[in-house]
């Protein structure tokens, strides 16, 4: 018989959607271990698996790639996956105030932030986060609205197939 005890949880949600709050609320109130996994940069699981399998050691991986590896090494039936989506107006206002992983050239003015090609970078080195591309085409998002639409679509249509 297969052990289906929930031992870990993970969260999928765009930046500024409440993932941090949800993580801490669960950890504070339940005896369960958190695995960051794909968290904000989700949908391109195969990209992360390819990078992980090509690495000779965990030292060659970014922190985020190591977090993904930790999640992938768990059996899905032992991981409770949460998905969180915030009201679109509140979300974009919050994201514009705190532009996590947004390239400097796309941060100002607001018109540029909402209308330019959207992609994510590692804040410490300005290198693009390839795992945060359009999960269907592997291209950058046309704009922040396409990012939101496709990530919501992934949460609704693809995530339930995995957990």
How would you describe each model-predicted region?
Residues 1-112, 140-160:
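PAPS-dependent sulfotransferase catalytic domain
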Residues 102-137:
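A solvent-exposed, charged loop/short amphipathic helix patch at secondary-structure junctions
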